[in-house]
Amino acid sequence: MSRRKQAKPQHINWEEGQGEQPQQLPSPDLAEALAAEEPGAPVNSPGNCDEASEDSIPVKRPRREDTHICNKCCAEFFSLSEFMEHKKSCTKTPPVLIMNDSEGPVPSEDFSRAALSHQLGSPSNKDSLQENGSSSGDLKKLGTDSILYLKTEATQPSTPQDISYLPKGKVANTNVTLQALRGTKVAVNQRGAEAPMAPMPAAQGIPWVLEQILCLQQQQLQQIQLTEQIRVQVNMWAAHALHSGVAGADTLKALSSHVSQQVSVSQQVSAAVALLSQKASNPALSLDALKQAKLPHASVPSAASPLSSGLTSFTLKPDGTRVLPNFVSRLPSALLPQTPGSVLLQSPFSAVTLDQSKKGKGKPQNLSASASVLDVKAKDEVVLGKHKCRYCPKVFGTDSSLQIHLRSHTGERPYVCPICGHRFTTKGNLKVHLQRHPEVKANPQLLAEFQDKGAVSAASHYALPVPVPADESSLSVDAEPVPVTGTPSLGLPQKLTSGPNSRDLMGGSLPNDMQPGPSPESEAGLPLLGVGMIHNPPKAGGFQGTGAPESGSETLKLQQLVENIDKATTDPNECLICHRVLSCQSSLKMHYRTHTGERPFQCKICGRAFSTKGNLKTHLGVHRTNTTVKTQHSCPICQKKFTNAVMLQQHIRMHMGGQIPNTPLPESPCDFTAPEPVAVSENGSASGVCQDDAAEGMEAEEVCSQDVPSGPSTVSLPVPSAHLASPSLGFSVLASLDTQGKGALPALALQRQSSRENSSLEGGDTGPANDSSLLVGDQECQSRSPDATETMCYQAVSPANSQAGSVKSRSPEGHKAEGVESCRVDTEGRTSLPPTFIRAQPTFVKVEVPGTFVGPPSMPSGMPPLLASQPQPRRQAKQHCCTRCGKNFSSASALQIHERTHTGEKPFVCNICGRAFTTKGNLKVHYMTHGANNNSARRGRKLAIENPMAALSAEGKRAPEVFSKELLSPAVSVDPASWNQYTSVLNGGLAMKTNEISVIQSGGIPTLPVSLGASSVVSNGTISKLDGSQTGVSMPMSGNGEKLAVPDGMAKHQFPHFLEENKIAVS
């Protein structure tokens, strides 16, 4: 930066001892010499003005003619008149020109010279002048050639650089000395060489020094007030804490000692200020005296800022202003604001203290600014410290976010996918994961189910529960806690909540005298938790403020879990893998299944496995088609209840026909509950099947009716086979099976087997008439003819039922309503349920059994079981969904018709041309192409009589064998197994279309009374024909298919009006 020339520059005159020379007007030569000199040119001669001018003539060539320099004040003048006027009024004191561009306070001229005198008189500068002795010999030490420019800093004279030393040693052989100072632009002083070096003492600078010291003392007092504020706050915390540890006491002692040190520093500052005030009154005060009056800093501890070693090191911003941040950083971590209750500067007068600091001059504002920043940070800690992690510097906005973060320290993942077993830390992650499973995509109901289960399972994952016994359950929350001595502190809640919520609290280990013995399921040597009210004090240094985690909160539990993660387990209900503490041993056992993947509870319908029985119960509701219980209708004769009015009507007709005794059966004490189910395996042995407890909230028969084995070898039988001796009982059981679901075929087949067992065990001369009728019905159920579609596969074993003449049939009009609703299982070797059962409303049918009955007999070893090849029935949810293409249908019949498109099944065959159709409606339309009249009853009768062997077109070659060997021979004392060889014949179309009207008009076959020990005997040439809705009638036929004459003694049908009433179809 270029320096501008001063208007009136002055030369520094180093001669002070010379007296005043007589003023003489300069000669022309002198004027020329003075004019030849540049402004600010040095005066090389220490003599008078004449000598100087003479010596300077040969040195410099004159440039200007009108330059005049005063010998006293070294002022330069360019006009002679001005110079002469100045000579008259000139004094020895040289003027000082200070050019300052800053706005700070500028010290006076006297203080500037006094400061220069101090610097020159400092002992560190060996070549400086002594203040009291400014002789010519002293001047020679610096060199008479030297010209010193005193540059004062433009900023505030508060930093150590403001009063700095001049360069040491002699100045080089030059007449100009420049000193670069920071923060200055232009500041030049010129003094005469003969001017005295600070002839006046530096008493004028003492008030400024005292002012700075007072500012420093004010800062110290503010620090003392702040530390006192901290001490009061800590005392308030200590008053709230019930138990203060040793560390807390040490912290308080350290804080008190620090406050006392601050007080001592303040006292030292006050003493120093008083000493300086006394010495300031002495005008002959030197720098050495000031040095002797410096503050003693050797006794100041390192916690406080050490004072400077000299007066010049006193600044407006000493290290003492950083006492508060340093002090806060030196405090133990327990005293820092980790919780909202431990926030500094919270009292109302702290803000007043900081506001008072703003009244200082100059640099004291920095203290208020830094304290304000600290106050803002402290207020931020109030907001953020509430959810601050104690183990890492992360801060969260909500408590739930902090809980999720704490799981990263514990490694806990409480949310488990029930399908694949993957674990997650948050419920949202589990939800997203569940939506990716194809099982959940197919059935969205499972998502809500799994989420509910996940919420319940994750509710007590972090709890460290303490079991409360029954005798202490009456304790209130306000009861005095019992302190536990001799145990490590875990920072637990101060009071333990009794009652059911006690499992959510945490407990530590108890003394040995309070610990019961280890449980057999826990590890050896691991004591159980004691009982009773337990109180554990918080950790030393931890303060419970207004924002601290509540007792028993999840955040506190997670924090304790992090602290105790490396400790050995002492709880018998604690998981050794993830260290989670469960409420009881059963919960712990279920929890271990999440680690091992064990799922012992398996659904017998779909084969899915679950880890708990409750989950299995919830899952069974998916398979339950209808859960509501409809209004039941009671039979007026035997008081049996039915949900379907049509079934009740048929039941009453059975009473009137003599098939069911009119006397009501004795009530069984196990109404609405099924006996122990029986599972029949391939080897014929019967075994009990486990069923759920009644306390689990599910009816036993409701569960057992849905039990389907995972394989085809075992089938559950809800009612023992001996119970089926009564027709009403068997009817009720089958109705109950149907109301629970449409797939109870195995029980129906078991009923047939049990009926054959009874017939074979009750008498050796019994014929297979009843069994043949069952087999015929069984095979006709498997046939694909239109008649077999509506065949009722039901034949109870009873004396009344053995009467082959008690037959009831339905009209073709009844088939119209029933054909579409016939239920089949679309698998290999399919079977079907009777449509009457399918139309029955869901109910819990009361099973009525006699007072005494025999147990289920074992199956003969020589009889091949029919259940070995039975496929597992398909159970659908409430919506009827196709398992192959995924289409949904409103009813099971529509789904059944749709499934025929996949299998290619065409069960309805034309009796004239043999063409097959998938639906009965298509077959009916096809009949019209043969030219038959529209009267379906007439058409059916003509087809059945005129072309009785049309249905045997496919396998007609077996018809003579069937009629010759079996149908035309007496059916007495024939092994039931021998009837199985004709299964294929019956499937091929042996069941012919017999018109119901003709049967009713011709009359039925008379029933022959038989005893309980023998089965019924069917006359030669009779074949049991089962209709779609009732047990079929026996038509006497000859070997060539002609209809035989009915004897006169045979009774007619008991219900001639059955056709008209049966037209009512209830879906």
From Swiss-Prot:
The modification Phosphoserine is found at residues 53, 308, 785, 798, 1029. There is a cross-link at residues 151, 317, 379, 846 (Glycyl lysine isopeptide (Lys-Gly) (interchain with G-Cter in SUMO1)). One of its GO terms (cellular component) is heterochromatin. Residues 810-829 have a biased composition (Basic and acidic residues). Residues 119-137, 707-716, 752-761, 798-809 have a biased composition (Polar residues). Residues 693-704 have a biased composition (Acidic residues). Residues 1-62, 115-140, 471-521, 682-716, 752-835 are annotated as: Disordered. Residues 15-42 have a biased composition (Low complexity). There is a cross-link at residues 151, 170, 185, 291, 317, 377, 379, 441, 557, 604, 630, 846, 906, 942, 957 (Glycyl lysine isopeptide (Lys-Gly) (interchain with G-Cter in SUMO2)). Belongs to the sal C2H2-type zinc-finger protein family. This is Sal-like protein 4. It comes from Mus musculus. The lineage of its organism: Eukaryota, Metazoa, Chordata, Craniata, Vertebrata. The gene is Sall4.
